[in-house]
Amino acid sequence: NIPLMVQGASVNWHWFYPAFDVSFKNNDELIKAGRKYNAVGYINSGWTDDPQTLMRLSWPDMAYGSIASWQSEPINQLAFFQKYTKIIYPAALAATVEKAHLALMRSESFIRKAVGQTDFALWEDPFSVKSLQMYEKNKENLHKGRLAAEEAQIYLRDALKSGIDTTSLFAMLVGAKELDLLALKYLYAGNIAEMHKKYSKKRDLKEFRMIMGEVTAYYHSKTVDMYDAIVETKEMFRKAWLNEYTPFRLGIPMAKFDMELQYWFKISKRLNTLAWNYKDNEELPNLQSLLQRQ
């Protein structure tokens, strides 16, 4: 008889904000199997193979697995964050942090339904045929996911004013910003694709140039929004990373943010040619050929 240990894991290795609804269920099922086969213990684990991972975001997973392994029945997942935050934070702060956790969990779930593994989706081509098909089927999931991410940011910025556990709360804020950026990227790309389709055959040039101004204008356009969101998220991620780790490997995610920024510079430049280089009855080029990511 060889002693058996069961090991669970936070679902964080391809998800920059953990998929708690998945990992909580995984914990329950693994613990159930461990009891069935008389396991002598349960191990929690988190993974940092992916350089986008902030381990502080997985702390609720660590707590859930540790608690669940000592219970005779599965934990009430709906009540978990209420109890978790009451133990960690003062009463005046706990409810706000609980709301932030729940909003983040909703945001991650909605966005994951749309894009799958969020780490990869953050850097993929939003104008590919595959991405635009995803957008068409998931507009509501992306929209709801972004709203929930923004809701979480409101709670977290309020909680950070307390000066309590600011390192963990800031990591959560970075997770919310990344979810916000991810949803924004695909919503904007889908909106641009819809605009391109509407005007692809012929167009009133005055109207078309005004619409294109909302996409590429120097001030307050969609592409400028993307520049700002990428740069802000990058610098926040850098700070959160250095709160947890040494600078080793930090250059990898930083380079990815830089590549994403350069990509949107290119998108803006190429889209701007549509407004001025084509006559009113001249067909616009195929969107994928115009904006292909290299």
Question: Which residues are covered by each model-predicted region?
Answer:
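Substrate-binding groove of N-acetylhexosamine-processing glycoside hydrolases
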Residues: 1-294
